[in-house]
């Protein structure tokens, strides 16, 4: 089996778990709000960062919160690495949602609906699972 096939199989096995992790982040209204002490982008953005840290820990990664500006983690602690950037804040929920409300994610006909699904909470979780696959498969 090729590396690509192993990773594809790994992600297929963990698909449902990944979907639930994306939903966890989408449920947080992380639209930028008024700055608060220790929360430079507001309450929701700080809550999203904490949810991201919880996902790191759930999957066995050590996370760091940089004063509620950003969070990060590493796979193996080597000096040379690859940065994967994503953000957990979103634009306001807005009106006109026909399948669900912005922060109540659903999956229908193989598609997920909710604010941040594709920009950028879904891709952030996909990056986390890519790191998890690399680590768990020993690459």
Regions found by a protein language model. Give the residues of each.
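N-terminal helical capping/dimerization or prosegment-like subdomains
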Residues: 2-85, 90-94
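Charged, low-complexity, helix/coiled-coil-prone segments
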Residues: 1, 69-73, 104-108, 112
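Active-site metal-coordination/substrate-binding segment of hydrolases
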Residues: 81-139
């Amino acid at each position: 089996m090729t590396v690509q096939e192993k990773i594809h199989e790994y992600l297929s096995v963990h698909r449902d778990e990944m979907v639930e992790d994306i939903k966890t982040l989408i449920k947080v209204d992380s639209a930028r709000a008024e700055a608060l002490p220790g929360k430079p982008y507001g309450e929701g953005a700080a809550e999203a960062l904490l949810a991201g840290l919880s996902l790191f820990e759930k999957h066995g990664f050590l996370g760091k919160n940089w004063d509620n500006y950003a969070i990060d983690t590493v796979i193996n602690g080597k000096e040379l690495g690859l940065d994967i950037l994503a953000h957990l804040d979103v634009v306001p929920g807005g009106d006109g949602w026909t399948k669900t409300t912005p922060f109540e994610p659903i999956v229908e006909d193989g598609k997920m609906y909710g604010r941040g699904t594709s920009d950028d909470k879904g891709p952030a979780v996909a990056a986390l699972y890519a790191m998890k696959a690399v680590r768990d498969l020993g690459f």
